[in-house]
Regions:
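A generic structural signal for short beta-strands and their flanking turns/coil linkers
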Residues: 76-80, 107-109, 138, 155-157
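General structural feature for long, well-ordered alpha-helical segments within catalytic domains
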Residues: 44-51, 78, 97, 101, ...
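Intrinsically disordered, low-complexity regions enriched in acidic/Ser/Thr/Pro/Gln residues
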Residues: 2-97
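Extracellular/luminal Protease-associated
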Residues: 101-143
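Long, charge-patterned amphipathic alpha-helical coiled-coil/hairpin "stalk" segments used as oligomerization
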Residues: 143-149, 153-160
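A short acidic, glycine/proline-enriched capping/turn motif at secondary-structure boundaries
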Residues: 87-89, 117-120, 146-148
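Short hydrophobic-aromatic micro-motifs
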Residues: 81-82, 112, 142, 159
Length: 160
């Protein structure tokens, strides 16, 4: 059963999304209008999906290939995106830009890494999860390999 507060939040989500659709430059106006803690505690992905569908924004679900490391993992936050590409020159530093991205994470950011499904190396592991947790990040979504899965599960850091 929805409470009046839930319905009010639903309206605020719709208002924020419409505002954001007009000012596509940043997702931060959307986040500033919605309390992410309330979304975490009271909203399910089905409610958010229904709101987006009602606004004509269909197909906003993640690919069936993107799954949580553990079924009890979920996350809510602002996307912090990174594009990665396979590197074939083994003599070059491969981590500087990735570390800079992790160092730039902030509270409630969700690191979203696109690698076009590369299977050459793990994109995420325990060290990055630890660094992201320290910076207040809310999770990570990757379209490639993850390592140190048992350690990440013990940490409880949401990785998809």
């Amino acid at each position: 059963m929805f409470t009046a507060a839930d319905l009010k939040l639903n309206g605020r989500l719709r208002q924020a999304a419409m505002h954001n659709a007009k000012a596509v430059k940043s997702t931060y106006p959307l986040v500033s209008m919605v309390d992410l803690n309330v979304v975490r505690e009271r909203m399910s992905s089905s409610i958010i999906s229904d709101v987006l569908d009602g606004m004509g924004l269909r197909g906003q679900a993640m690919s069936v290939d993107v799954r949580p490391l553990s079924e009890d993992m979920s996350t809510v936050g602002t996307a912090f995106t990174m594009l990665m590409a396979d590197q074939y020159d083994e003599g070059k530093d491969t981590f500087t830009l990735q570390f800079q991205a992790i160092d730039s994470l902030g509270k409630d950011n969700v690191m979203v890494i696109c690698s076009n499904g590369s299977d050459r190396a793990a994109l995420w592991g325990e060290l990055l999860s630890t660094a992201a947790t320290y910076r207040g990040a809310a999770g990570a979504v990757i379209d490639g390999l993850a390592r140190d899965v048992s350690l990440i599960k013990k940490m409880g850091f949401p990785v998809f």
